[in-house]
């Protein structure tokens, strides 16, 4: 099982976040770097994702992008019993 800790204070762009997830969780080369593709990949992944300082996403990415990203994480974890999400 892949384990990934995302420190939101260190994420400054959506592209950086998608790249981190793709590289660390081994997404396929054709990963689309968007929220729909993220959901698809996460619902097919066995992983534990921990997000530190989630409030920093809103500061760094903007409120709407941060909310959308976190919603995809929650929805993916709900749909996939092999995906564990920890928000700290």
Pin down the residues of each PLM region.
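Positively charged, polar, low-complexity stretches
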Residues: 1-88
């Amino acid at each position: 099982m892949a384990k990934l800790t995302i420190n939101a204070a260190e994420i400054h762009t959506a592209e950086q976040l998608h790249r981190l997830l793709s590289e660390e969780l081994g997404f396929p080369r054709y990963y689309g770097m968007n929220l729909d593709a993220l959901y698809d990949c996460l619902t097919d992944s066995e992983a534990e994702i921990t997000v530190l300082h989630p409030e920093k996403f809103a500061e760094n990415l903007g409120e709407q992008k941060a909310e959308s990203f976190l919603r995809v994480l929650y929805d993916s974890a709900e749909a996939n019993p092999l995906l564990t999400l920890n928000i700290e």
